[in-house]
Amino acid sequence: MARVKRGVVAHRRHKKILARAKGYYGARSRVYRVAFQAVIKAGQYAYRDRRQKKRQFRALWIARINAGARQNGLSYSRMIDGLKKAQVIIDRRVLADIAMHDAVAFAALAEKAKGALAA
């Protein structure tokens, strides 16, 4: 059986990792051993942060809704409760967008929530 030298395979593997580490600082983009660790860690961060992104955006939406609700004399939780009781089906992403860009429409929603809470 012929001897298999793995130089070509190793070179390809190293090239692939170094390509993924392109743009990293210092040895992280030049030295295979360090680049490999950096790429693995980057993958772990990416995996973790894809999940965290969902939480962070929801927290941002809630903060924006809360700010808008307080300008209209409600707290966030009372606003959401009032909208649910008024059977207004609108998600937090859209509600936050309305709070940011259309104060008049948000005030109308707040009044609707207040009405449902009073009833």
Swiss-Prot record:
Keyword Transit peptide: no
CDD domains registered for this protein in UniProt: Ribosomal_L20 (cd07026)
Alphabetically ordered keywords of this record: Ribonucleoprotein, Ribosomal protein, RNA-binding, rRNA-binding
Classification via SUPFAM superfamilies: Ribosomal protein L20
One of the GO BP terms on file: translation
Statement: the UniProt record of this protein carries the keyword rRNA-binding: yes
GO MF assignments: rRNA binding; structural constituent of ribosome
Name of this protein: Large ribosomal subunit protein bL20
Species, as recorded: Acinetobacter baumannii (strain AB0057)
Taxonomy of the source species: Bacteria, Pseudomonadati, Pseudomonadota, Gammaproteobacteria, Moraxellales
Gene behind this protein: rplT
